[in-house]
């Protein structure tokens, strides 16, 4: 019995070490969102223009809502701190990410999705080449595993909605399209 307990502890510490995170880019005490509760987080996320009651009554599971924020607002600066291409590059450098499982590279060519993934571990030089030279979109799955800021935001949403919240980051070069036009049946946030 003692050996299995020791192995269990060792396995759990290994899994905690497996995910390495880059440095935090923003002081959490200067958050734009209110993180007191899941409700206050979601209310501050959708903004005062709509409000939570109107959102739930008129939009939730009924129709899409597009919220456009003024470029001069603190919101834009805050969102820029949540995730960036530089953060992704650092994550790729310090973690053993896998194509398909953690990250995809793709581009729309003649109305068809072209995949740039390789087999095995993600290599930063390949991602950089595909993004910069081939204008491929980077799709990064579950970024909250590597970003405490995103994890905190998603955790509050999960608490408020009492449901799991999925997250992907799509980074697409200017004048490019990574995926064909499609209709999503879930909440989508675009920055």
Stretch-by-stretch model annotation:
Residues 64:
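Short hydrophobic/aromatic beta-strand or adjacent loop that forms the aromatic wall/cage
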Residues 70:
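Structured beta-strand/turn binding interfaces of compact recognition modules in eukaryotic regulators
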